C-alpha cells in the first residue's frame, strides 16, 4: 500500500520511483469509475469555469493560496496518481484497476458546480488550512509515532471495506505476483483491519522506508 497526499504535484515523481522500484504486475487505485467518467465528461468545462472565477478574484486582489489551488484542481483534473499508475501500467503491460466506490464519488463530485462558484472559491482559495506541509507532518506523526491527528470516518470505513474486498477478488482472479494499492495516506491507518487479510506492507511515498 502506497500512501499519497492527494493533489500534491511534488508527489508525482516520488510515486513514479516507488512504482518502478516495487515493479508490481497489478496496480489498484483509490479512484472510482464514476470519478473517471465525470472528469472525461465535465473536467474541461469545470476547469474553464473555475479558471475564469479565479482570474476575477486575482484581479480583485485576493491572494491565492497555491496549495488550496492545487487541491481544487486535483478534484477537477485526473488525479496525479491515476496518471502515474496509468503510464506505469501502459509501459509494463500490466493491469490497473479502479477500486473505489462510485456512490461517494457521485455525491462529492455532483457538488462541484457549487464549489467553484466565485464566492465559494474566495473562501476556499484564501485559506491555507490544508497545506502539503501540514499533511506530511500529520502523516509522519501517525506513521512514525502512532499519534492520530485526523478522523477515520464511517465513509472511510465503508470505502476501505469495499476496496479491500475488491482487491481480494482481483488477486484471486488474476493471481499477480506483486500488487501495489495506491491510496490517500489516511487509509494506511486501517483501524478495523480491513486490509489485514491481504498482508500489506505500507509506505508513505515521501519516506524511504516501509511503515509496516
Q: Residue locations for each model-derived region?
A:
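Compositional signal for N-terminal targeting/processing segments
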Residues: 1-212
